[in-house]
């Protein structure tokens, strides 16, 4: 029994050691430094949200680092209309390596979502996720249109103080089909009103001519 207990303790100790590999350690001559290798979007022009941001960071130091921060989205004079979190899970970047962090802005109207059928995500013939527009009229005030600027602000600890990392990217949301439909509706309305006014004016002039 003592041998069994000792073996269990040894197993637990080995397992515990494996879990603690990335715990912070005071390394002599430790260098903590992070650079932005890329701050980009999956595209620059959108008809509707979502917009997915990719932040690629490079750890140029010799110890692992877990930077965190936010992306602040502005639209003209409207500041911070959305705030997205980066690296919420506190994922580490290993020394001399890159790591990508993604964050998605989907707070719009309408918005593309994954098509779900029978509780499963629908894929097309090429294995890509099929998406469809979700029209939640309670979010009608969140119709996005125009130029947007995303400003990234991350922070990491260099061992002495918090070091900021910044980046900026711009993109456009143009719901062109909604604009086209609205234009056509307005055009028909204008033609209808114009025809009605012309008809009324013609009848009035004819009536005046008879009298």
List where the protein language model places each region.
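Alpha-helical transmembrane segments
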Residues: 185-202
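Beta-sandwich strand segments
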Residues: 2-16, 81, 159-166
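Short, flexible coil/linker elements and helix-boundary hinge sites characteristic
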Residues: 119, 127, 192, 206-208
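Cytoplasmic C-terminal tails of single-pass
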Residues: 201-211
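Extracytoplasmic/cell-surface-exposed regions of Actinobacterial cell-envelope-associated
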Residues: 4-5, 99, 210
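Alpha-helix initiation/capping motif
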Residues: 1, 175, 193-196
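Membrane-proximal extracellular "stem/stalk" segments
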Residues: 27-180
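Surface-exposed, gly/pro-biased binding rims or lids
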Residues: 4-39, 176
């Amino acid at each position: 029994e003592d041998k069994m207990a000792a073996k269990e303790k040894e197993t637990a100790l080995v397992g515990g050691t494996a879990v603690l590999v990335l715990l912070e350690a005071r390394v002599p001559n430790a260098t903590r430094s992070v650079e932005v290798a890329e701050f980009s979007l999956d595209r620059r022009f959108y008809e509707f949200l979502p917009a997915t941001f990719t932040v690629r960071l490079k750890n140029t130091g010799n110890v692992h680092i877990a930077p965190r921060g936010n992306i602040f989205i502005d639209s003209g004079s409207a500041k911070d209309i959305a705030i997205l979190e980066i690296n919420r899970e506190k994922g580490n970047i290993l020394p001399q390596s890159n790591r990508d962090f993604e964050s998605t802005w989907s707070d719009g109207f309408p918005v593309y979502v994954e098509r779900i059928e029978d509780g499963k995500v629908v894929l097309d013939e090429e294995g890509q996720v099929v998406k469809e527009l979700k029209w939640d009229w309670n979010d009608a005030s969140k119709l996005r249109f125009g130029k947007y600027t995303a400003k990234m602000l991350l922070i990491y600890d260099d061992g002495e103080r918090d070091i900021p990392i910044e980046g900026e990217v711009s993109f456009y949301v143009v719901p062109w089909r909604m604009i086209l439909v609205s234009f056509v509706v307005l055009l028909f309305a204008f033609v209808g009103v114009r025809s009605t006014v012309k008809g009324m004016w013609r009848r009035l002039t004819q009536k005046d001519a008879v009298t």
